[in-house]
């Protein structure tokens, strides 16, 4: 394969990304040096505005996998990725209206605290451990996979980029906390958009303008976006993307620690919701840029596909190879695109490190040592950031030894997200579900999603369901085509062409629905949770959204939870919501007499104030 090496200006532009990201961490370390509470470090004192949080949310979940993978996906399969714009609408709506209000008003820092308040400690710890394991694994692969693709095309040093990513992310996470992560993400989001725009402008000029791009893409069937085939085995259809994609991304947005931690860092609930809705705009922009990049790339390589001809060895290398071609005479711009790709990586890794440190501190350290001083709590949080930074970087090294297992590791994020979504849905929406149902549902959902996913890796779906659109090598000057003959499998199990051939976008739906169904059944078999024993602020009464329902039907759907009782209204009116100190309620078990006021929360304003007395240590 022909490797086009970086020039000096490319390295300068790329290095600038790391220098500025580190500088933001140093800035917030100096600016916030007198504020040493864990609350300031982990959730920014709950005083963030919606703007930077919205940019941070978008950057955190639009990783280098999106920057490199989505254009390659469009190049091979067409522009059906545009349908994810519909999925994102449902995801943001359900997150902001169903999950966020409960998490924000509760005053929790770790989303898994809710599981102890609603169920018990074993459920909380089981969910936390699953989250930690899958996040470390996923983050390691997110660091390694794009670094490998860029190395093989641009000659950019593989391990230098891997370790630089790990070191820089760990550096600014441990120095500046959540504020540094959010503002660095905002900067990296701008870099991603600028990088995409340069590719779109230069790429469309190379192929004769945007109209020419659309014409060639249309002739190549790349603009066939909507396919209403209801077959769940088809890789991408309208239904798999809008329904399966909603479940997949709701597992990432609705109950993921990285998302919720940013939302609860906002100064009011309104700001948190605005952050989510403005983040929707960011998601649309990034996906649109990625899709159009794929269409331009197809127009450029229409008559000589570098993948089929053997010039590159994997689809993920298409985008870097394309960039090196169109910017061959423009030093610095290839470096800008690599900075764009690594902005996605940096933001994802930083979000993961910060979230991992938060859940570990809140769910394990604080539970074992509830009376830590603020200064010691902050230092422990910083130490956890360093620890998880090392672990995620080490996981990238392990990923290099995995071979074909890398694809499986990338899917674990979705495979775990579905059951976790089901678990929180059981807690928020179904008051009668008890802790046995929750734990049994989680295990059932994990089992189902891993079963179908692992089966699909061992027995790939028939080519008729996953075959890419036609690619041509007709006008290639030099061909080095390697034909791989698929091994003949003597026999396939009965489930291979049905259950194991399910579209990967349904993995989360299988896990979520399996968790919910099992949780409800187990709760009925073991004795339902009595509604009157559950604090109403732990439940989100979905039926209340239907304003035309009579109070009689709404009360019936409350399943005994006293949403209209005077006590609940008193909680909201007097500034009292849950606990007299979150830790007190968690340590004593969830009893009505332990649910008191959260310091600093004003339910009328739905906001947090920094005016509450807080033990602050000055260096």
UniProtKB/Swiss-Prot annotation:
Keywords of this entry: Cell membrane, Glycoprotein, Ion transport, Membrane, Sodium, Sodium transport, Symport, Transmembrane, Transmembrane helix, Transport
Chief place where the protein resides: membrane
Membrane topology term: Multi-pass membrane protein
PROSITE patterns for the chain: NA_SOLUT_SYMP_3
Primary gene name: Slc5a12
Topological region Cytoplasmic: 31-47, 102-128, 179-180, 257-275, 343-385, 433-437, 526-619
Protein known as: Sodium-coupled monocarboxylate transporter 2
Origin superkingdom: Eukaryota
GO molecular function annotation: lactate transmembrane transporter activity; monocarboxylate:sodium symporter activity
